[in-house]
Amino acid sequence: GGAGLPRAEASFDVSEKNSVKEYILRRLLYSAMTLLAIATILFVMFRLMPGDPTAQVISPALDEVAQRRMREAFGLDQPMIVQFFLYLKNLVTLEWGRSFTTSEKVFDILVYRFWNTMLLMAVGLLLTFAIGISVGMVMGWRRGGKLDLGATVVSLVMQSAPPFITGILLLIVLSYRLDLFPTGGMSSPGNRPGDLLDFIVSADFLHHLVLPTITITAYYLATPMLIMRDSMLEVLGSDYVEFARAKGLPPGRVMIRHAARNALLAVVTIFSILLGFAIGGQVIVETVFSWPGMGLAMVEAAARHDYPVAQASFLMLAVIVIVMNLVVDISYCWLDPRIRLGS
């Protein structure tokens, strides 16, 4: 009878591994379908915008032959369905065309902007989650204390203020009146080292980074902090925490090693949701602080009817959200084994 157990366990391991592969493949398929849907919506939306985008590059003063050649160069003479499939092919091959206003390659414009956006967003979200998890852990451990009540009120007040209001107030008080921080941009004129690492650790860059980071952190801090607090309260009533206390372990070790470690799973689940909101907020923050990222590029391009840049910016922001959601889904699959064999 016992001889059959190893085969049964091996069979279970194989089925579990297959379920993980199926789950990952399913998520990859959903992500690809979502990206295709977004690309299609962007193609249609930018061609339904009011105004004539071709007026930016095709002057009415040109004769008909010159205008026709310009339309052919930009592929605007083709039927809409042909333009759509060319658009999809160009997306895959990274041939995103040229800007209608500057004639630069769209890919070259946005690669530079992409890293600027990722840098600001990464610093803002890392700070948000680091503070939120740490404070939320202590709030849950000391429920009903002054920190619990005070941090809850302050975080909810900060979250209720839109990021553009917070950003403008910070600029008025700390930049214009007190002259403590720059009013915008990533660096002072003529003060940008060639090496990326030297630049991001320079005092000038960090000085420009402070206000946008405070704006992002202030707006999104309440979510991870309050979820960590509530998750801690649930975990603190569990048997293994009570057992750790009964063993006489130090309170700090019980809080961090036994309670907080298990409470973190709830925070991981909301990361992808918060990321989606953060992408939308990034557009506002970059516009308020003149941060040269994709959000600002998208706003400027939409205002100029430069739809090659605008739709590529939208798409790149969507790709960031989709990829990060995929990473979180897969990591959650490993963190919570119930997902592997679940629906």
Q: Locations of the language-model features?
A:
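Hydrophobic alpha-helical transmembrane segments of membrane transport/permease proteins
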Residues: 34-85, 174-201
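An internal, D/E-rich "acidic patch" concept
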Residues: 14-17, 77-133
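Transmembrane helix irregularities
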Residues: 49, 158-161, 279
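Alpha-helical transmembrane segments of integral membrane proteins
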Residues: 19-23, 110, 114-147, 163, ...
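Pore- or pathway-lining transmembrane helices of multi-pass membrane proteins that form conduits
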Residues: 148-171
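Intrinsic, low-complexity polybasic segments
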Residues: 2-4
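Hydrophobic alpha-helical segments of integral membrane proteins
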Residues: 28, 70, 77-96, 106, ...
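Charged, compositionally biased N-terminal leader segments and the immediate start
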Residues: 16-45
